Amino acid sequence: MEKMYHVGFDDTHGAKYVILPGDPGRVEKIAQFLDEPHFYCQHREYTTWLGKVDGETVMVMSTGMGGPSTAIGVEECYKTGVRTFIRIGTTGGIN
């Protein structure tokens, strides 16, 4: 498989789970709660780290701001084998 155009990685990561903060600055902080955290990839607004939870590979990837960049990140992660998406962070549009 070729690398995904926007997120910058292919399917060799082995993760089926991804935690999705919006801010790239939060990715490393979140990854430190995983076992064996390590930097994986950075392309555009998508900063990605990998780690383990109970022996399973878990990805932490920023999505940038807004729905369109989140949709692109989710779609490209799905194409690489990720099947569970956990969004964490704030919601700016609620009154």
Where are each of the predicted segments found?
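Metabolite-binding pocket within alpha/beta catalytic cores that recognizes anionic/polar moieties
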Residues: 1-95
